[in-house]
Amino acid sequence: MNRFSFPLLAALLLLIAVPAWAQTDVLGQARAAMSNGDYSRAATLLSGLIGAQPSADAYVYLGISYAHMREWQRAEDTLKEGATRYPEDPRFHNELAGVYLAANDLDRARQSLKQALTVDPANRYAGDLLATVDMSMGNVEGALEAWNRDGRPVIGDVLHNGHVEFENWTIAKASTFRTGEILTWGKWKTTEVRLRETAIYANTGLEIEPTPAPDRYTAVIRAPLKTNSTEQLILPALEALFFRSPTLRLWNLRNSAVSLRLNYRFATNRHRAEVGILAPLPLPGLLFLEATGTYRSERWDISRPAIDTGVDHRFRFQSTGVRAKVKHIPNYRLELGAGFEYRNRTASGSQPGIALDSRNTGKLLFDASVLVYDRRLRSRIQGETLIARKNLLGDMDYSSGTIEWNNRYTLDDEGKHSIEVTAKAGTSRGALPIDDYFVLGVRERGNNLLRGHNTVSPEGHYGNSPMATSFTLVNATYDRQIRRLPFFNVLNFPYVDLKWLVFADGARTFDRAHVFEEGKILVDVGGGFKLETPTRTFNLTYGRSLRDGAGTLAAYVGRRW
């Protein structure tokens, strides 16, 4: 057997080691040049090395050198080539994110950081930078999801508008996170929903700031309190113009979190006065108490939706009532409510079947809402029911309930295009009084939208749209944002989104009492404009009924969800 001689073996090892030594030496020279700020020399050395003996380190350092030389395109091309040749190395995606951030391209930076986390889920640098980028874009959910990958952010201090002392006691009671706990999206969202339900804050937001302590962060709740300045009188003036129903709102009386609402509708044939109080109760998680007292004096004319039996379809309705209701929000996905309402009624007319008499009603009220899905698609199921009984201070026995399924899908990342579809159904038992019939159509604060039918006649009478003891209803709306108008909390909201919309509504009604027409499929189509704040909407639409060809131009307000 032939054996290698020792000199031959040494020569062979030397030949193998020379290229590696040479590569290491060139990399060392390039790193030294980079340390001295001589990125041009480093780029020259690394370019030659890649041509002769490419490596992941050479590509990474060359991309960094080009970035420091502000040659962004060459840096991007180099790092992308390196990522293609060495797909298991997350450094290329980390550095690409830095290149995109330098160009203020936040979307592509986020994409690169997500790719880095796909390659290495334990990449703390990419996770932290992704969370920081998301926070700067206002994407709190994305930021918290990125941090939560490795058990962050652990909360050190909780501030309100940058202050250690909370400006109102509801902050502490609504909050679901404490010092030393990991903040998750669910905890913040529950806190945010509770704060908005108090109705005393113009807006709510969250900022996460690092602290000198490792892995500790400060949570800053941004929630400016609403004011009762004279500028707020603009809204009642607009309500008087559009609805003849101005509402004076006094927020957070003496910083107690109690708010007062005074409303008077002076519309001909539809007078109404209401006093309402909203008071969060100082319990863990908050319990919301809303109490209202209402007076109504109205003239109705139901000749359009009623079956023509030859009787006079006009009548007068009056009532004085009180309502108290409590709501609890254990989680942002779940809301529960219960209450009681008493009405002292007086009604007079010749129309049979709708309790035109002086019998009073006492009712138990229950409602629940479940947010089933909360991503680009938001899906919610909610139900309401009332139970009227003679042993509840009333003179009538009946019940009714509704269930609805709300869906909204955002078509783009910016949230400027969306489609909303709602399916709703209601039913009842017992002889319903006219004031608890289901009414479909458009009114100031309508719950059952059929936007080609106005609930009010040109003469100002209620009873102009379909009414029923049970119904099914579908609403479909597409809207697109035209512009976001900043208001800087001048009118107690930070901004208003101006949108245009088109819609199609379909419904079918039924009436056990055989007072109103039933069974026909109703279809309304139309369009209009919408103003949206973070919590409310104002809509101005024109809808046309395909069943009878009638059209209506109407304004109404709603609540965002």
Name each region found by the language model.
Residues 86, 91, 98, 102-241, ...:
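Periplasmic polypeptide-binding modules associated with outer-membrane biogenesis and secretion
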Residues 197-382, 443-468, 537-539, 544-561:
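Gram-negative/organellar outer-membrane beta-barrel architecture
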